């Protein structure tokens, strides 16, 4: 029997301090050469054990082998020059120096497949692997070749599909596409963003997910969120299109958020990764706070389709805080799972009593 309310993380977890400076995005590696290769494997083992000890059900790699959730993938592609950089506005809210697309993009070799094989050897639990989505990749580059966000996105979709198929062959059970750009460029999402995502999942023999959030707890994101008003209804613009898509699982943030949780109704029928852990604060949720968020979500999603998760990745947090939040996620899910199982037993007993009365 499949476990009810299986827990997972949205993506990144803090790296060990011997591998990279903690609590920092884009943190450079402290090791080189063969030491870095082995160090990354050791970090994968540590990340796995952190999740196992916390009782997380669906394991991720914690993004231990990458410096950034988007650019590490792009670094492995041809047609992109990391020395030729331009300043662009990422997610339409902050300036960043990014590499330039200078020619046709392609994937000469697999990017994360060896890492996935290694993680598969370490655990029998289900594995979810996150890779960037086509639109978010486009939004993290300067394009001097295709001169069209849509054309570049379609090329990335084909490349991501190649990578995803090999990840599945390596033993990955769920492929997650990270698309924070979906929360910003609504017209493009509906015109071609979801279609490109469908191209990326084409032919995959596994479950697929899309993660759409309001970002890490960094200043650029928290400042942006202050401009969004008392209700964050961005999901309302994109959920109807996603509801009709072939994506199996849709992720959204709910904990300590201004997102009206009833927006989940727009994607009823899909499996939902409900963000029940706030990654923008060092305050560790209580199990009851997590449980309260999950109970609210259950008004709009069937229990068998609810996947408790974190709002986003936790790279900027300390390992102690991240560990506490993982424990809270599991404990909160346990509370609600036990409530649901108790209700189910009561309903079964009630039915038995009714049948006995008839007989």
Locate each region found by the language model:
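Domain-level signal for soluble alpha/beta catalytic cores
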Residues: 1-359
């Amino acid at each position: 029997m499949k476990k009810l309310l299986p827990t997972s993380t949205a993506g990144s977890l803090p790296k060990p301090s011997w591998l990279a400076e903690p609590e920092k995005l884009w943190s450079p590696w402290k090791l080189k050469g063969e030491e870095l290769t082995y160090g990354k494997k050791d970090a994968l083992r540590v990340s796995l054990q952190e999740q196992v000890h916390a009782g997380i059900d669906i394991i991720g790699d914690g993004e231990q082998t990458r410096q950034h959730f988007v650019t590490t993938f792009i670094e492995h592609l041809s047609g992109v020059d990391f020395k030729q950089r331009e300043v662009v506005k990422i997610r339409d809210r902050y300036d960043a120096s990014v590499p330039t697309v200078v020619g046709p993009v392609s994937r000469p070799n697999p990017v994360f497949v060896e890492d996935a094989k290694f993680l598969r050897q370490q655990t029998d639990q289900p594995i979810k692997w996150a890779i960037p989505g086509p639109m978010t990749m486009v939004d993290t580059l300067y394009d001097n070749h295709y001169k069209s966000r849509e054309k570049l996105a379609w090329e990335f979709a084909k490349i991501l599909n190649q990578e995803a198929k090999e990840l599945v062959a390596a033993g990955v059970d769920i492929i997650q596409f990270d698309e924070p750009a979906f929360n910003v460029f609504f017209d493009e999402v509906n015109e071609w963003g979801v279609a490109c995502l469908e191209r990326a999942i084409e032919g995959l023999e596994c479950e697929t997910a899309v993660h759409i959030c309001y970002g890490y707890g960094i200043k650029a994101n928290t400042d942006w969120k202050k401009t969004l008003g008392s209700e964050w209804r961005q999901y309302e613009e994109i959920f109807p299109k996603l509801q009709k898509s072939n994506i199996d699982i849709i992720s959204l943030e709910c904990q300590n958020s201004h997102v009206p949780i009833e927006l989940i109704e727009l994607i009823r029928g899909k499996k939902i990764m409900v963000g029940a852990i706030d990654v923008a604060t060092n305050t560790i949720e209580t199990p009851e706070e997590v449980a309260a968020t999950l109970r609210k979500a259950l008004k709009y999603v069937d229990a068998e389709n609810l996947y408790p998760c974190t709002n986003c990745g936790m790279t900027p947090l300390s390992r102690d805080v991240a560990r506490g939040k993982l424990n809270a996620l599991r404990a909160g899910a346990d509370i609600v799972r036990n409530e649901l199982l108790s209700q189910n037993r009561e309903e079964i007993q009630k039915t038995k009593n009714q049948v006995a009365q008839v007989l």
